[in-house]
Protein backbone atom coordinates (compact mmCIF):
# COMPACT_ATOMS: atom_id res chain seq x y z
CA UNK A 1 0.00 0.00 0.00
CA UNK A 2 1.22 3.49 -0.85
CA UNK A 3 0.07 6.37 1.32
CA UNK A 4 0.88 9.95 0.34
CA UNK A 5 0.11 12.73 2.82
CA UNK A 6 0.95 16.39 2.94
CA UNK A 7 0.70 18.70 5.90
CA UNK A 8 -1.58 21.70 5.41
CA UNK A 9 0.19 25.07 5.40
CA UNK A 10 -2.06 28.15 4.99
CA UNK A 11 0.94 30.30 3.94
CA UNK A 12 1.77 28.09 0.99
CA UNK A 13 0.20 28.87 -2.38
CA UNK A 14 1.80 26.16 -4.51
CA UNK A 15 0.39 22.82 -5.56
CA UNK A 16 2.28 19.59 -5.07
CA UNK A 17 2.13 17.18 -7.99
CA UNK A 18 2.81 13.51 -7.40
CA UNK A 19 3.13 10.93 -10.17
CA UNK A 20 2.58 7.33 -9.16
CA UNK A 21 3.49 4.48 -11.50
CA UNK A 22 1.81 1.13 -10.99
CA UNK A 23 1.50 -2.18 -12.74
CA UNK A 24 -1.18 -3.83 -10.62
CA UNK A 25 -3.76 -1.84 -8.69
CA UNK A 26 -6.75 -3.27 -6.80
CA UNK A 27 -8.12 -0.31 -4.88
CA UNK A 28 -7.88 3.48 -4.86
CA UNK A 29 -8.66 5.72 -1.88
CA UNK A 30 -8.46 9.49 -2.36
CA UNK A 31 -9.30 12.10 0.30
CA UNK A 32 -8.83 15.88 0.28
CA UNK A 33 -6.96 15.80 -3.05
CA UNK A 34 -7.29 15.96 -6.81
CA UNK A 35 -6.34 12.82 -8.73
CA UNK A 36 -6.35 12.18 -12.47
CA UNK A 37 -5.60 8.75 -13.88
CA UNK A 38 -4.03 9.06 -17.31
CA UNK A 39 -4.20 5.35 -18.17
CA UNK A 40 -7.25 3.08 -18.24
CA UNK A 41 -7.50 0.99 -15.06
CA UNK A 42 -7.97 -2.61 -16.24
CA UNK A 43 -8.91 -5.15 -13.55
CA UNK A 44 -11.45 -7.90 -13.04
CA UNK A 45 -12.39 -6.40 -9.65
CA UNK A 46 -11.65 -2.80 -8.63
CA UNK A 47 -12.67 -0.64 -5.65
CA UNK A 48 -12.79 3.17 -5.50
CA UNK A 49 -13.22 5.21 -2.29
CA UNK A 50 -13.44 8.99 -2.57
CA UNK A 51 -14.01 11.38 0.36
CA UNK A 52 -13.24 14.73 1.91
CA UNK A 53 -13.91 16.93 -1.10
CA UNK A 54 -11.65 14.96 -3.42
CA UNK A 55 -11.88 15.46 -7.18
CA UNK A 56 -11.10 12.28 -9.13
CA UNK A 57 -11.22 11.45 -12.84
CA UNK A 58 -10.59 7.96 -14.17
CA UNK A 59 -11.41 5.53 -16.94
CA UNK A 60 -11.99 1.89 -16.02
CA UNK A 61 -12.40 -1.41 -17.81
CA UNK A 62 -13.55 -3.93 -15.20
CA UNK A 63 -15.89 -6.83 -14.63
CA UNK A 64 -16.87 -5.71 -11.12
CA UNK A 65 -16.55 -2.14 -9.84
CA UNK A 66 -17.35 -1.01 -6.30
CA UNK A 67 -17.56 2.73 -5.58
CA UNK A 68 -18.00 4.67 -2.33
CA UNK A 69 -18.08 8.45 -2.74
CA UNK A 70 -18.75 10.78 0.22
CA UNK A 71 -17.92 14.16 1.72
CA UNK A 72 -18.69 16.68 -1.04
CA UNK A 73 -16.44 14.97 -3.52
CA UNK A 74 -16.60 14.88 -7.30
CA UNK A 75 -15.96 11.62 -9.12
CA UNK A 76 -15.95 11.35 -12.91
CA UNK A 77 -15.88 7.79 -14.25
CA UNK A 78 -15.80 6.61 -17.84
CA UNK A 79 -15.25 3.27 -19.54
CA UNK A 80 -17.19 0.09 -18.90
CA UNK A 81 -17.91 -2.45 -16.21
CA UNK A 82 -20.23 -5.40 -16.17
CA UNK A 83 -21.30 -5.04 -12.52
CA UNK A 84 -21.40 -1.77 -10.58
CA UNK A 85 -22.12 -1.40 -6.86
CA UNK A 86 -22.16 2.23 -5.78
CA UNK A 87 -22.91 4.26 -2.66
CA UNK A 88 -22.82 8.05 -3.01
CA UNK A 89 -23.60 10.54 -0.25
CA UNK A 90 -23.28 14.36 -0.32
CA UNK A 91 -21.22 14.11 -3.52
CA UNK A 92 -21.51 14.13 -7.29
CA UNK A 93 -20.64 11.14 -9.45
CA UNK A 94 -20.65 11.73 -13.18
CA UNK A 95 -20.72 8.37 -14.90
CA UNK A 96 -22.39 9.61 -18.08
CA UNK A 97 -19.62 7.86 -20.03
CA UNK A 98 -19.51 4.78 -17.78
CA UNK A 99 -21.37 1.88 -19.40
CA UNK A 100 -22.68 -0.85 -17.09
CA UNK A 101 -24.69 -4.03 -17.58
CA UNK A 102 -26.05 -4.32 -14.04
CA UNK A 103 -25.92 -1.62 -11.36
CA UNK A 104 -26.84 -1.42 -7.69
CA UNK A 105 -26.87 2.24 -6.64
CA UNK A 106 -27.63 3.91 -3.28
CA UNK A 107 -27.71 7.71 -3.47
CA UNK A 108 -28.38 9.91 -0.43
CA UNK A 109 -28.03 13.32 1.22
CA UNK A 110 -28.37 15.63 -1.77
CA UNK A 111 -25.95 13.61 -3.92
CA UNK A 112 -26.29 13.38 -7.68
CA UNK A 113 -25.33 10.38 -9.83
CA UNK A 114 -25.39 9.88 -13.60
CA UNK A 115 -24.85 6.42 -15.12
CA UNK A 116 -25.59 4.26 -18.17
CA UNK A 117 -27.12 0.85 -17.57
CA UNK A 118 -28.24 -1.71 -20.13
CA UNK A 119 -29.89 -4.69 -18.39
CA UNK A 120 -30.54 -4.32 -14.65
CA UNK A 121 -30.78 -1.34 -12.27
CA UNK A 122 -31.44 -1.52 -8.54
CA UNK A 123 -31.61 2.00 -7.14
CA UNK A 124 -32.42 3.68 -3.83
CA UNK A 125 -32.53 7.43 -3.29
CA UNK A 126 -33.13 9.37 -0.09
CA UNK A 127 -32.86 12.85 1.41
CA UNK A 128 -33.15 14.84 -1.82
CA UNK A 129 -30.69 12.72 -3.82
CA UNK A 130 -30.89 12.36 -7.60
CA UNK A 131 -30.13 9.40 -9.85
CA UNK A 132 -30.19 10.08 -13.57
CA UNK A 133 -29.64 7.12 -15.86
CA UNK A 134 -29.48 6.37 -19.55
CA UNK A 135 -30.44 3.06 -21.07
CA UNK A 136 -33.46 0.78 -21.02
CA UNK A 137 -32.81 -1.85 -18.37
CA UNK A 138 -35.22 -4.79 -18.61
CA UNK A 139 -35.10 -5.10 -14.82
CA UNK A 140 -35.65 -1.93 -12.81
CA UNK A 141 -36.02 -2.07 -9.03
CA UNK A 142 -36.23 1.41 -7.56
CA UNK A 143 -37.17 2.97 -4.26
CA UNK A 144 -37.36 6.57 -3.13
CA UNK A 145 -37.50 7.13 0.62
CA UNK A 146 -39.95 9.21 2.59
CA UNK A 147 -37.50 12.13 2.62
CA UNK A 148 -37.46 12.57 -1.14
CA UNK A 149 -35.10 12.26 -4.02
CA UNK A 150 -35.76 10.89 -7.47
CA UNK A 151 -34.71 8.34 -10.07
CA UNK A 152 -35.13 9.36 -13.72
CA UNK A 153 -34.35 7.97 -17.14
CA UNK A 154 -32.82 10.75 -19.24
CA UNK A 155 -32.75 8.98 -22.63
Predicted regions: what is each one?
Residues 75-155:
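Short, surface-exposed interaction patches in beta-rich subdomains
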Residues 1-51, 64-68, 78, 82-85, ...:
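Acidic (Asp/Glu) and glycine-rich low-complexity loops/linkers
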Amino acid sequence: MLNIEERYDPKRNTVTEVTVYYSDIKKVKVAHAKAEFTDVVKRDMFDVEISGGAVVTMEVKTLDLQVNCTGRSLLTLSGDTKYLTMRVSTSNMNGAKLYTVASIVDVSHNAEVRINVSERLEAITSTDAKLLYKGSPAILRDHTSLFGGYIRNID
